Amino acid sequence: MGMATYAVVDLETTGNQLDFDDIIQIGITFVRNNQIIDTYHSMIRTNLEIPPFIQALTSIEENMLQQAPYFNQVAQEIYDKIKDCIFVAHNVDFDLNFIKKAFKDCNIQYRPKKVIDTLEIFKIAFPTDKSYQLSELAEAHGITLANAHRADEDAATTAKLMILAFEKFEKLPLDTLKQLYYLSKQLKYDLYDIFFEMVRQYDAKPLDKSYEKFEQIIYRKQVDFKKPTTNYNGSLKSLYSKAVDQLGLTYRPQQLYLAETILDQLMHSEKAMIEASLGSGKSLAYLLAALMYNIETGKHVMISTNTKLLQSQLLEKDIPAMNEALNFKINALLIKSKSDYISLGLISQILKDDTSNYEVNILKMQLLIWITETPSGDIQELNLKGGQKMYFDQKIETYVPARHDVHYYNFIKRNAQNIQIGITNHAHLIHSDVENSIYQLFDDCIVDEAHRLPDYALNQVTNELSYADIKYQLGLIGKNENEKLLKAIDQLEKQRILEKLDIAPIDIFGLKASMNEIHELNEQLFSTIFTIINDSDVYDDDIHRFHNVFTFETKDILKDLHAIIDKLNKTLEIFNGISHKTVKSLRKQLLYLKDKFKNIEQSLKAGHTSFISIKNLSQKSTIRLYVKDYAVKDVLTKQVLEKFKSLIFISGTLKFNHSFEAFKQLFNKDVHFNTFEVNTSLQSAKNTSVFIPSDVASYQYKNIDEYVASIVSYIIEYTTITSSKCLVLFTSYKMMHMVQDMLNELPEFEDYVVLTQQQNQNYKIVQQFNNFDKAILLGTSTFFEGFDFQANGIKCVMIAKLPFMNKHNAKYWLMDSEFTSTFKEYVLPDAVTRFRQGLGRLIRNENDRGIIVSFDDRLINSNYKNFFEQTLENYRQKKGDIQQFGKLLRQIQKKKK
């Protein structure tokens, strides 16, 4: 890191408008030689009002600035401290531009010689982090950040993380460090100087034995699993007793009963359905059952979960805790398909790719560091998104395996016999094919959160043709000899001529003409689809914010598909008899496109269920064509039911109408299931009230203003009485945003933070919601499950409408052919399940107290009300107007105290 001094700066401001907002706090942490050597901190007075959101975010109130200096009073002092330093900040543009503007207003010209963005550093140094938000980085790396969004603490935390990153860089093998230096020249800021100094000062030594080398890549040596050591002669009951005692948990007979039930089903190779509701301790129960089964039989068990979060919890928290508590060494491993694991040949190809793109360059640097760390080579560890993911997926699709390639999937296969517990998720479980030998090694499977299986199966059987994807894939080939793969082919042809390579001549001009025609044919195809949309009945899917066309003629689409497939075939003929690796890459890309079009063509010809989706009705580029290739029931039967000798489905919401029959109907094979119900140990009836307003008008689709106003009135009543946070669940974005707009205009919510669901931001929003004392979270179907609501006071969940999927929802359309009565057999059970999941957001432990408000009068007035009423049997129910609602809140508040 050298002897340079780094000024790590963080600012808090009244907003993000450079020309209108002011700095209200500055924190600077000075770093030299990987040590914090000094700090500076000051509140900054402003004549502007501090918005309520900023006050809530920073905990800085206007009275705290009354004795603080204005910036012009400390500007020279700050400038003198940082003028010779390397300027560092997290998301550096924001802080640098604000401080330069503030200096300029004081007639000080500040131009740092070097600038470092820690967002850039942390993406490279910590490639597997799920988020690069400062608070989440701090938590992930064990750094205490008590008051996020306070400049002094944020600056210190950023500095500590930067030191961690630099120390990590310095420990890397020299060859890796050199490659990082060369790649860093393409970054936005001055990180290349840092890498240069690290390379220059590197203490040369032989490559550590924990590493191996493939071509130019240094990677972590793979260490095979040892056979498991779990010598145990006792019963499951004694194993359970020891586990809960060592883990400091409460001994719960129902949890033991659940574990014993699972073990019994495994031992007898049975198929079972178990509804184990909230509080039954499913995870520990099935882990102990799987472990005991392995001890007694030597067989290993596959556990499939719904989310990556639960996967991580099992592998990184629950199983290590069990190992420590029981003094065992349980071999557990994440199991996926071959395409989910990296090969070093693929990384080598990516590093050699001359694509000039900032995100791709960051990805290359991330790969170099990640491969020195990862024991598994699981690509999802990288959490790729956006352009990086599209680029990476394309590279996988077109990768031609290198000779002597090192593929991490082979390591997983080699060690599968020594695995006691395999962890996977529903998507991989359903996606795995017959040739996937890892899954074939498991005879027994436990499926947690089994009620979600149909959704993953539907995704699996639905094929998609997207304008954006095809345009991107074609762009990777290029239109002329100066672009992408065409450029590589052009260079190969020149090399053939100059060096007299032993390959056939390549018709570059013919290839270029063919590619231009393919581009034009693709435009014609999507123009045809665009015309169909404009001439058809279009239905809004408000949940997913798309417009759908369900009924349309496919004749013109098939004509265009045939033309583009024919042209792709003729283009592929250009490369007949040529086996050079550059040609193979282009052929593979063309074959990928051909297969994409061909699969859609075959499905449409066969009359499979299809629909067209468009995000923006005026933009052809947002079109997607979907075709359902197989029945969900067929896939669930083949990929799940028939794959294992013993199979146990577990969920808190597996039953409908007091029966498991609805779930059984998801399989098209008549198989006997043993069924069990494990009641929760939480006394939800004592803790939870369900309030059904009697003064809210019935929902009217064409006029929802009155309905929305009623919801807002109840939110006001709740927050006024309790000053607590509230989760409001909607079935449409339209209604959610109407409520949001009204809340933001009302003075009652000036000291509240109103958070709204945003695409790809759910994790961040949930964290914010749980951190604020006064917050209202507005969300749609995503938040009906899998969301841990944390609050110190009363907890409240308001359900705007019962969670029925709209008749014009794509799921409804795609599943319609699989049921005699789609509403009764699919839509109604799905709505009841989601409603039950929504109720489950409230009471997460024995100490929780709260209230559920359901505004939809169909809960008590519809023909199917009894199905929902069954879900409320364990809750105290109350009907009344808003005054009675307030009275109930005061009673609950009194009990909470």
From Swiss-Prot:
Its EC number is 3.1.-.-. GO terms for molecular function: 3'-5' exonuclease activity; ATP binding; DNA binding; DNA-directed DNA polymerase activity; helicase activity; hydrolase activity, acting on acid anhydrides, in phosphorus-containing anhydrides. 3'-5' exonuclease. GO terms for cellular component: cytosol. A motif (DEAH box) lies at residues 448-451. Residues 241-496 form the Helicase ATP-binding domain. ATP binds at residues 276-283. Induction: Down-regulated by agr. The keyword Cytoplasm does not apply. Belongs to the helicase family. DinG subfamily. Type 2 sub-subfamily. The keyword ATP-binding applies. Gene3D superfamilies: P-loop containing nucleotide triphosphate hydrolases, Ribonuclease H-like superfamily/Ribonuclease H. This is 3'-5' exonuclease DinG. The gene is dinG. Residues 703-893 form the Helicase C-terminal domain. Pfam families: Helicase_C_2, RNase_T. Residues 8-161 form the Exonuclease domain. Keywords: ATP-binding, Exonuclease, Hydrolase, Nuclease, Nucleotide-binding. GO terms for biological process: DNA replication proofreading. Signal peptide: none annotated.
